[in-house]
Regions:
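Solvent-exposed soluble domains appended to multi-pass membrane proteins
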Residues: 1-191
Length: 191
């Protein structure tokens, strides 16, 4: 199985804008940002509010610039979270971002408009961080992080289930990229 590439920008570009990874190209990094047609522009034209959440700095990979140039109305990042909740260079823990997102999504739902929201986690990226309040079964860092990521998703779904917008929401869970092993090229040659 293949993902959109081996970098976060490949996942955002491929998943939300339907473009494949291009060898040695970082499409989100350009100073002059071209307009791409993707799910955000299509849904925004049809009356949807468009949001993107990340646990960390929205300037990483120029995510905020790219998303806003391509019909994302609001990007929520570490600049929005209470500073005491930022635990690593990757910002807040995933479960905190999920909890933080629910009242914001409620505000958008209260406006009577449908919305699309992408919530990008970072718990499976180094430096690995598992909050003290979560006790994984595994002693292995990689497995503990997987357990924590699963827990974080369950926190979000339990909170979302209580909201009025839950019954009309399609939840799609995807990876922004595959696990990086030994890579000679940015993409597998068989791709």
């Amino acid at each position: 199985a293949y993902t959109a590439g081996i970098h976060t920008y490949n996942g955002i570009y491929g998943t939300l804008f339907s473009y494949p990874s291009l060898y040695r190209q970082h499409p989100m990094k350009n100073c002059s940002m071209p307009k791409y047609h993707g799910i955000y522009s299509t849904l925004r034209k049809n009356g949807y509010s468009t949001l993107f959440f990340t646990t960390h700095d929205a300037q990483f990979d120029n995510m905020e610039g790219f998303m806003k140039a391509n019909d994302c109305e609001r990007v929520v990042s570490d600049a929005d979270y209470p500073s005491e909740e930022i635990k690593t260079t990757l910002g807040v823990p995933d479960d905190f971002m999920f909890r933080y997102s629910v009242p914001i999504l409620n505000d958008y739902a209260a406006k009577g408009k449908p919305f699309i929201a992408t919530l990008m986690t970072s718990s499976d990226h180094g430096p690995y961080y598992v909050p003290d309040y979560f006790q994984p079964k595994s002693d292995d860092d990689r497995n503990a992080v997987i357990e924590y990521a699963d827990y974080s998703l369950s926190v979000f779904l339990k909170e979302a289930r209580k909201q009025s917008w839950f019954k009309n929401t399609l939840f799609v869970f995807i990876a922004d990229h595959g696990a990086i092993g030994y890579c000679v090229y940015d993409m597998q040659l068989s791709y």
